[in-house]
Amino acid sequence: SFPDTPIFLPDMLYTIVALHNYELLYGSGKYQDALSRWLEKAQTVWLDKETGLLASMLTRKLRKQTSKVRGSYTALNCSLLAFCADDAFAHDQYKLFKKLFIKKSPVFGIREFIDKSPMFSFDVDAGPIVFGLSPSGTTLALGAATWLGDWEMRSRLLQTASTAGDTIVDEAQNTCHYRLGEVALCGEAVALGMRTMVNLQTLNTNL
């Protein structure tokens, strides 16, 4: 992701999704071997031993993870895996993610940390963490919930995004804006991208 720093799995996954979509469009087989080998590593070597979730960050030689899994990165992992992994792995990761990272009170959303719930702190990727709730994790989880047809989860996440994001309306421009997006990684553009990740095959199904 950056020179001389750990490798972020979600950043790698964007590349994998791009190659996967290329193969879907052109069927050349040019990148199929690389895709297969990457996904095999993801399902075996790069899983967090404590949770079974895909790691958030790896050492530069891709041999082991450098930190505990986190809500913001895992939410993005799940949303991107929904595009390119086999259904069983994508669903299993999403179910594990929900089990470990859903925070039901005082506001429904995605927690940033498994082992702590800070009253308030700030993270460059997660944004302002309040009562342990991750703004980025909550927004990015919309993608997986939408793609996998988890409509109840999607609805509750959208309610939180609208409320906690502090939606403001510009009547002159006829637009809405998440004030939180001015200080957090995820604003309305990311939320729109995630909430419109519709898979036509799941429109009439629920997890």
Predicted regions located by residue number:
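CBM-like carbohydrate-recognition segments
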Residues: A90-L207
